[in-house]
A protein has these predicted regions:
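N- or domain-start disorder-to-order transition segments that initiate the globular core
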Residues: 1-41
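N-terminal beta-rich core of secreted/periplasmic extracellular enzymes
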Residues: 25-42, 72-83, 89, 120
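Acidic (Asp/Glu)-rich catalytic clusters
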Residues: 40-43, 70-77, 125-130, 213, ...
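Conserved phosphate/anionic-ligand binding catalytic regions in large, soluble enzymes, centered on
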Residues: 48-61, 323
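Conserved, mostly hydrophobic/aromatic
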Residues: 52, 261, 327
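Short acidic, Gly/Ser-rich segments with clustered Asp/Glu that frequently serve as metal-coordination loops
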Residues: 54-57, 256, 264-270
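Active-site-facing alpha/beta catalytic cores
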Residues: 66, 79-244, 265-266, 270, ...
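Internal helix-turn-beta structural module
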Residues: 304-344
Length: 346
């Protein structure tokens, strides 16, 4: 094989033993999970915001940001459930660039996966302990989910991973909502097939074990836009797109039809300021149709402390080193605006 085996990494159980979750925090996560699940099963009409930095690059800034979210959450709790994004591993279009805290706990240092495993667990634990949030992360590597399985309340499977069998089967064994993004091509049948696979039980190999999964009835769709064969971005958040997904759900027989709309990526053509307009357009679409209202459960928004993005070596506190994000002032106002629109029945 054309690779060097550097060292054996600790198992998830070994990492959890070194950095255990106490019973009080476990109860907080359980309560969060219950509230979030009720949205996806239709028992609650609260609106979900999966919101936070494109990538969690440094612990201090991410925790600062999440504490700010906590203050806002308490003011909009009648309408909104905030699930902070703590994305600790990042897919890269060409394979080059910062791959997230799991790979590089210090973005300016060489990769160190052992330090990365510890860093991402500590970060998610701090979010729960200091702000009461059990957060969202992307399942880039299915075999790594168990390092954080007692801390996460939401998982996303990305556009480049959604066709992969191991991602689908692992999602079928999780007991939290898993969002399946449409692939970069925009083929909605791929996304629906992925949800179908995740909602059913399977026998497969996971971390060296033969396992049986029970199926995940809260696996659902994330619409993130798409790229055509010429490399041009196209949105899929408009009213007619939502109606099309609703029709696909009706034909599929899938449980708990649900959509989260990603306001960035190809939906915004990575024009981060467009996220504000897109969020409000989705809310308008919800107002226009009862079936869209029932299906669209929330939004995914990329947001941090400072507007825009930077190179990793610029070291501006709270500014994204991957995709550009909304800054805090715009984020806070957008959340308040969304809550007010919801209070007025959209």
């Amino acid at each position: 094989m054309n690779m060097e085996f550097l060292r054996k990494l600790p198992t998830p159980q070994e990492i959890k033993t070194l950095y255990p979750l106490n019973s009080e925090l476990a109860k907080v996560k359980e309560k969060n999970d219950e509230e979030i699940r009720k949205v996806f099963t239709g028992e609650s009409d609260k609106f979900i915001l999966v919101i936070g930095p494109c990538s969690a690059d440094r612990e201090d800034a991410v925790i600062d940001y999440i504490k700010r979210l906590r203050i806002v959450q308490d003011q909009v709790a009648d309408q909104i459930i905030i699930i902070p994004r703590i994305y600790t591993n990042k897919p890269r279009t060409t394979g080059a660039g910062y791959k997230g805290m799991l790979h590089q706990p210090n973005p300016l240092s060489d990769p160190d996966m052992l330090k990365g495993l510890v860093a991402i667990r500590k970060l998610h634990m701090r979010a729960l302990e200091e702000a009461g949030f059990s957060c969202a992360d992307e399942m880039l590597y299915p075999e790594n989910h168990r390092y954080l399985s007692d801390l996460l309340s939401y998982v996303a499977v990305g556009a480049r991973s959604v066709e992969d069998q191991q991602h689908r089967l692992t999602a079928s064994g999780l007991d939290i909502p898993v969002g399946m993004k449409n692939p970069t091509s925009g083929d909605l049948s791929v996304m629906m097939n992925s949800i179908n696979a995740a909602q059913h039980s399977h026998t497969f190999i996971y971390r060296g074990w033969e396992v049986d999964s029970k199926g995940n009835d809260t696996a659902h769709a994330i619409l993130r836009g798409y790229v055509d064969k010429r490399g041009q971005s196209h949105p899929n958040y408009h009213y007619e797109d939502l109606i099309q997904v609703h029709e696909l759900y009706e034909k599929s027989g899938l449980l708990n039809p649900a959509v989260i709309v990603d306001t960035n990526h190809s939906n915004s053509n990575k024009k981060w300021l467009e996220q504000i307009r897109i969020a409000k357009e989705v809310l308008h679409s919800i107002k226009s149709s009862e079936k869209v209202y029932k299906m669209v459960k929330g939004l995914m928004i990329e947001s941090y402390i400072e507007d825009g993005s930077q190179k990793a070596d610029e070291c501006v506190y709270g500014k994204s080193i991957t995709d550009p994000c909304l800054g805090w002032e715009k984020t806070e106002q957008l959340i308040f605006d969304i809550a007010e629109i919801r209070r007025n029945k959209c």
